[in-house]
C-alpha cells in the first residue's frame, strides 16, 4: 500500500516547483541558520566530515556548497591498474550486468531499452548493443561529484529534457522507465576500451546538473534537446580544444543526490563479478577490467 502511495505522489507532486524552491533554499546564504541546518543534516545522516577537503562548517556559506563538497585527496584511493575501470561515484549499486541486445533490465515486466535511455540516437545505441551497464544511486548524504572510470576523449554530449521523478531505489524498482523519462545528460567518451557512456539522471529536488567543461547544463529547463558534438580528430568542433578527461578525475556533479549510469560496449569490459545490486559503491574501487582497443 505504501509503495502505491509513493508512486501516486510521483504523479501528483508539483516536482518542478518543489525542485525550484529547494534550489533557491540550497543557494541561500543563511549564516548561522545554514550552518545549523548543515550540522543537523550531518547528524541525521552520520556524515564523516574527515573525508571532506573542508571539514570546517564555516567553509560552507550555502547548502549547495556543502552538498557539492569535495572529498579529501586521500579519502578515495584510485585503483592504478591501467586495465581497471573504477567506480565513478559514491552511492549504492542498484543494477549491474549485461545488456541483452538493447534490453538493459526489467521493472514490473517492462524492459528498459537502450532506445529510450539514449533518446533514440541510433549512432550511440549501436555502440552498446549486447554490452554491459551499471547504475549507481547517489543518496543525499554522499559526495555528489562524478568521476571518470577510465581516461576518455569526449565525443558527444546530449541534454534530454524530461520529468523529475524520484530515483530512490524504492521508486525505480516499482515504476517503469524512470531513467528514460527523467531529464538527463548523456556524455559519450571514446576510451582505450571502446566507447563509454556516462549518463547523469535528473530527479526531484536535484537543482542542477553540471559538467566540468560546460558548467551548468540544467537549469534552465527549456524543454528542448541540446546536442554538443566533438570531432574524432582531436579537434573539438564546439570549442577551441579537445577534451580528454583522465581516469579518476572529476567530470560533473549534482546539486543534491541522483543517479549515474555507465554503459560499455560488447566484449569491451568484464564487470567485477564481486559487485552485486545494493552493494555500497565507493569512488576508485574496481568496477571492471577492460580489453584495450589500441592496436
From Swiss-Prot:
Cofactor(s) required, per the database record: pyruvate
Positions bearing Pyruvic acid (Ser): 258
Enzyme class: lyase
Disulphide-bonded residues: none
EC number: 4.1.1.65
GO BP annotation list: phosphatidylethanolamine biosynthetic process
Site label Cleavage (non-hydrolytic), positions: 257-258
Localization per record: Cell membrane
GO molecular function, one term: phosphatidylserine decarboxylase activity
Catalytic residues of the enzyme: 90, 258
Catalytic reactions on record: a 1,2-diacyl-sn-glycero-3-phospho-L-serine + H(+) = a 1,2-diacyl-sn-glycero-3-phosphoethanolamine + CO2
Gene Ontology CC annotations of this record: plasma membrane
The UniProt record lists the keyword Lipid biosynthesis: yes
Posttranslational modification: Is synthesized initially as an inactive proenzyme. Formation of the active enzyme involves a self-maturation process in which the active site pyruvoyl group is generated from an internal serine residue via an autocatalytic post-translational modification. Two non-identical subunits are generated from the proenzyme in this reaction, and the pyruvate is formed at the N-terminus of the alpha chain, which is derived from the carboxyl end of the proenzyme.
Keywords: Cell membrane, Decarboxylase, Lipid biosynthesis, Lipid metabolism, Lyase, Membrane, Phospholipid biosynthesis, Phospholipid metabolism, Pyruvate, Zymogen
Summary of the function given for this chain in its UniProt record: Catalyzes the formation of phosphatidylethanolamine (PtdEtn) from phosphatidylserine (PtdSer).
Protein name (Swiss-Prot/TrEMBL): Phosphatidylserine decarboxylase proenzyme
Organism of derivation: Blochmanniella pennsylvanica (strain BPEN)
Gene giving rise to this polypeptide: psd
Amino acid at each position: 500500500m505504501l509503495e502505491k502511495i509513493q508512486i501516486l505522489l510521483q504523479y501528483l507532486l508539483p516536482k518542478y516547483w518543489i525542485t525550484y524552491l529547494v534550489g533557491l533554499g540550497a543557494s541561500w546564504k543563511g549564516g548561522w541558520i545554514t550552518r545549523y541546518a548543515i550540522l543537523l543534516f550531518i547528524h541525521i545522516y552520520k556524515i564523516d566530515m574527515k573525508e571532506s577537503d573542508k571539514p570546517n562548517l564555516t567553509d560552507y556559506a550555502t547548502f549547495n556548497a556543502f552538498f557539492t563538497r569535495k572529498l579529501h585527496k586521500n579519502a578515495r584511493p584510485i585503483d592504478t591498474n591501467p586495465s581497471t575501470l573504477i567506480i565513478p561515484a559514491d552511492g549504492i549499486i542498484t543494477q549491474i550486468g549485461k545488456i541483452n541486445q538493447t534490453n538493459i533490465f526489467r521493472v514490473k515486466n517492462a524492459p528498459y531499452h537502450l532506445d529510450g535511455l539514449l533518446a533514440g540516437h541510433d549512432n550511440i545505441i549501436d555502440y552498446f548493443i549486447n554490452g554491459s551497464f551499471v547504475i549507481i544511486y547517489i543518496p543525499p548524504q554522499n559526495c555528489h561529484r562524478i568521476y571518470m572510470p577510465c581516461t576518455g576523449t569526449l565525443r558527444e554530449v546530449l541534454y534530454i529534457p524530461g520529468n523529475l521523478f524520484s530515483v530512490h531505489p524504492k521508486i525505480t524498482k516499482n515504476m517503469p522507465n524512470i531513467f528514460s523519462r527523467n531529464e538527463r545528460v548523456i556524455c559519450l567518451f571514446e576510451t582505450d576500451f571502446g566507447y563509454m557512456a556516462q549518463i547523469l539522471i535528473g530527479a526531484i529536488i536535484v537543482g542542477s546538473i553540471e559538467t566540468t567543461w560546460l558548467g551548468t547544463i540544467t537549469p534552465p529547463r527549456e524543454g528542448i534537446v541540446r546536442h554538443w558534438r566533438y570531432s574524432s580528430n582531436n579537434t573539438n568542433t564546439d570549442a577551441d580544444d579537445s577534451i580528454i578527461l583522465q581516469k579518476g578525475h572529476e567530470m560533473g556533479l549534482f546539486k543534491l543526490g541522483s543517479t549515474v549510469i555507465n554503459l560499455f560496449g560488447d566484449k569491451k569490459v568484464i564487470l567485477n563479478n564481486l559487485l552485486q545490486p545494493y552493494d555500497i559503491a565507493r569512488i576508485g574501487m574496481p568496477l571492471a577490467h577492460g580489453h584495450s582497443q589500441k592496436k
